[in-house]
From Swiss-Prot:
Pathway it works in: tRNA modification; tRNA-queuosine biosynthesis
Enzyme Commission (EC) number: 1.7.1.13
Presence of the UniProt keyword Coiled coil in the record: no
Gene Ontology CC annotations of this record: cytoplasm
Lineage summary: Bacteria, Pseudomonadati, Pseudomonadota, Alphaproteobacteria, Acetobacterales
Annotated positions binding substrate: 74-76, 93-94
Gene name as annotated: queF
Keyword annotations: Cytoplasm, NADP, Oxidoreductase, Queuosine biosynthesis
Superkingdom field: Bacteria
Molecular-function annotations in GO: preQ1 synthase activity
Name of protein: NADPH-dependent 7-cyano-7-deazaguanine reductase
Function: Catalyzes the NADPH-dependent reduction of 7-cyano-7-deazaguanine (preQ0) to 7-aminomethyl-7-deazaguanine (preQ1).
Major location (coarse): cytoplasm
Pfam short name (any one): QueF
GO biological process terms, semicolon-separated: queuosine biosynthetic process; tRNA modification
Organism, as annotated: Acidiphilium cryptum (strain JF-5)
Length: 154
């Protein structure tokens, strides 16, 4: 059975190659199934990668995105390809994290969004970057992001 509401999607159900850059990646959205309810959608990307803009060395992060939809939800295959497009993108941790959050906010206009990017150590120092659009709506169930602080071998 084909649902014509999804015919405009360019990637879901089709062979898609990894975009060359985040700017070239196409993020897609579909209508939210339940408007007016404070339900949280969570995406976890435990193997996010990008490149240091200075050295070109790989950086790795565990990224958790939580949002409360309004009219739209992100199509998950397009999000997977978007996040994968950072693999050859050179930017500092903070820039990558905020670029992801801002692109999703622009696309979805969610009721609320937060991102936690838990970057693995480079030079012995882990960098964690957090951002959210504001206070979450009252009554929303927001589980902890579930990523323990980095401890190394200790």
């Amino acid at each position: 059975m084909t649902d014509t509401r999804y015919d405009a999607l360019q990637q879901l159900g089709r062979e898609s190659r990894m975009p060359d850059s985040p700017e070239a990646a196409v993020l897609e959205r579909v209508a939210a199934p339940s408007r007016g309810k404070n339900y949280v959608v969570r995406f976890t990307c435990p193997e996010f990668t990008s490149l240091c803009p200075i050295t070109g060395q790989p950086d790795f992060a565990h990224v958790v995105i939580d949002y409360i939809p309004d009219s739209w939800i992100v199509e998950s295959k397009s999000l997977k390809l978007y996040l994968g497009s950072f693999r050859n993108h050179g930017a500092f941790h903070e820039a990558c994290t905020l670029m992801i959050a801002e692109r999703l906010v622009d696309l979805l206009a969610p009721r609320w969004l937060r991102i936690g990017a838990y970057w693995y150590p480079r030079g012995g120092i882990p960098i964690d970057v957090f951002w959210q659009t504001g206070a979450p709506p009252e009554g929303a169930y927001l589980p902890d992001q579930g990523v323990p602080p980095y401890r190394g071998r200790g």
